[in-house]
Amino acid sequence: MRAFIFDEAGTGKTKRSMDLLDGAEHILVICPASVVKTAWLPQIGQWSYGKALTIEDYRKIGWPEDYRFLVVSYNMAAKLGEVPDGFSLIVDESHMVKNPRSGRSKTVKGISDLAKDVLMLTGTPAPKDLEDLYGQTVVMYPHAKDRTALLGDSWRTLGTFRMRYGKPYTMNVQGRLVVKYTYSKPMVEEACRQLQKLVLDIRRGGNPLPQVEWLPSPKTEQEDVAFEQWTNTHQLAEDVYAASASAAAVKLAQLDDGFAYKTEDRGESYWFGVSKLKTVYSEAKRREDPTPLLVWTRFKAVRDEIYRTWTPCTDAKTFLAMTGQERGKYRLIVANPQSMGTGVDGLQHLIKDQIWLDLPWTYADWEQANRRLVRRGSPYQGQQRILVPDTPWNRKVMDVIEGRKTLDDIVKEKQLG
């Protein structure tokens, strides 16, 4: 059996994968490092049978016959040596092997080639575009002949995949023309119909995401002036726009948050405005709800500034590990949506409202983060709120998330007012 499990967050992908492999004698789990001990080992004990070991144990004693599970992180998977014949493989958060050229993907692909069964789990199968699905399929079926037998010749190589489903366009990247591919909705639908042969019935949480609430967040004249200075005097148009849409969008998101990095190593930041932070603080202060407010931001500079200017404050994983008495004093919890995996399962029982300082570029990333709270088992069903500071940039990114525009579109609109 080789299959994808694309179930929504909170619907039990982990348990489902173990149930499907109930008859397997040995199971190798490859997952993010953050969930080896916080999610997989506890859930193996709760939902399955047999002993489990980690890479630390494996490097000392190998994989003894009487141990059913071996759980390793993506980073340590390359350290594996001998494994039992006929083992089964679970690849958790499989979108992490979406790039067939990466060392991580090549390592897991080699392991997959040796496995009897392969289950690949993710709630965000295509974080960036359709090519993410192709990359994961290469890991599931390492040999082109097997992929083409199931999915057709278009899935033989990335080149044939692009030729069938994509439309090429050129862009200038640091002075040279590079060919990129865009995928229309009909082509995405056609590719997904083919891939459906490998996808188990998708389980959905049944809880729709709440309607976004836009919070007024007017910028000061000083912030507008500083924004213009940074975009003009720091050659944003020439240096960043020429690199890629995502690089430009990251820079624009930082400026919208009110800061810019002074140095390339991002060791020092310059803050010229705090209107968005004030929006967060105002919401936290006026809340009558006893639960804290979860603040999403991907930038370390923003998290550091919140820690400096609002106390007490902590990150989501630390908050989750606290006792009930310790949690009571916190009104703000900070989290990075890019590193929030299943290691924070349980947060939905403690927090109901979330606010986004800066938004992701894809609906998949948006939904996965929001589903950390809006999921089965939450005692706050129907009461959760998703809040976003109302700035022109956040409005434009929401257009991308909801499919009305592309990242290229909004980056080309240099005038953000």
Regions found by a protein language model. Name each.
Residues 3-4, 8, 94, 100-101, ...:
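Interdomain linker/hinge connecting the two RecA-like lobes of the SF2 helicase core
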Residues 51-76:
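Inter-Walker segment of RecA-like/P-loop motor cores
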Residues 16, 23-46, 127-132, 298-301:
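Conserved Walker A/P-loop ATP-binding site and its immediately adjacent core
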Residues 70-90, 96-110, 335-345:
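Conserved RecA-like ASCE ATPase "motif II neighborhood" in helicase/translocase motors
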Residues 73, 303, 312-397, 403-404:
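Conserved RecA-like P-loop NTPase helicase motor core
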Residues 35-59, 140-144:
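Conserved helix-turn-beta segment of the N-terminal RecA-like "Helicase ATP-binding" lobe
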